[in-house]
Amino acid sequence: MKVVSCNYRVKNVKDIETPTYTILTNNITPEYINLELLRKIDKKFIINCSLLEIYNNLDVFEKVKEYFSSNKTNEVSGHYLHEFCDFQDSYRYLNIRNVLVDDYNINVHKFISLKYDNSTAVFSIDDYIKCLKIFEPDIFCIPCEEIKINEQVGKKKKNRIINLMNEFLEKVQIIKNTNLSNSLCILSIPCTVDIDTVITETINKYDSIIDGILLSGLGYDESNETRTNAFKNILNILPNNKLKFIQLSNGNPIEILHAIYHGIDVIEPNFPYYLAKNGKAINMNLKMDNLQDGNEYNLQDKNNDNIYDINLLDFKNDVNFIIDLNNPKYVLDHSTITCNSPRKESKSYIHHLLKCHELTAHVILTYHNLYIYRSFFQEIQLHIKENNFLSYINWFIEKNELNKKEE
């Protein structure tokens, strides 16, 4: 069968192989889980550190940096934050939007205005540069207004977005050549806005300092079909050698496969955390043991009823895919969460913890869900390398019955 030429690929962020995902945080600490537990799931990972939280605690980081810089001896090595916050074996990603937060808004004009829930901060571009200099992230994202699909944007606003983008890049270029020479610069681009020509000029001008692109304005409630159109429009004009990032307020497996199919390298999904927060566990088959003739499926072959077009498919049939451990039917169920779970706790025990409102339940479920997602990404990497990723997509949909229509 003919192999479809697509953008999915294996690359690297630092020494982490992609496609991969990031660890989401609240107050610069992982949601429900600590770094020690995360290291049991993966040797190295990218940890999100939101700009608002860094800015609100900048005076603390500044004092810490001062202290460790003045007291540093030859025996002490590594970044000062590793001594202070135990960020060892992680890459700190200074990001703008926190996908764990529903009520998010960013406005970039003369000042940057960030709002998460009830917390708001207003600061200048120079304040942002100061955050970079003090926090010294391994990866950082340049702020841009979040413009969702179907949001109307006039010519004046488009020009303002590009002008501010150039202003940010001009200042970042200076510190990239001094303080942050080893840090990756990710440019946030509103891919829902028609700015093809001018954005190409900006990327070409600052090509030497731009390491990746964040496709902003996507990852909310739009369907895969709608998102596909946005992908096609923006990815056609972006250089292929740049890393591609996306933030998904859901980030379920179908959305993950869809994003990777279109060449996204780093995904920020909320799915594992949202489920754990609500007492739910991911239950999915991951390992495709047998290939059908070792060939790729042609996703464009509409005559084959057994082929699923990932561009048109949305996440359905979560009844078997998600285990709701709040359900009383698990009171006497002494089996583990799933057959491929890294945890030994029984469903009945976790149900009991949830009923008693014990935080331990969310810790266990977060660990389980992140482990399953890490295994999922490892399988994806494997099948891309073996040139059967499209087969894996089709197998995954069939095996997990994600193709069933809602009743």
Curated annotation (Swiss-Prot):
Pfam families: TGT. Belongs to the queuine tRNA-ribosyltransferase family. It comes from the Eukaryota. GO terms for biological process: tRNA-guanine transglycosylation. The lineage of its organism: Eukaryota, Sar, Alveolata, Apicomplexa, Aconoidasida. InterPro entries: Queuine_tRNA-ribosyltrfase, TGT-like_sf, tRNA_ribo_trans-like. This is Queuine tRNA-ribosyltransferase-like protein. SUPFAM superfamilies: tRNA-guanine transglycosylase.
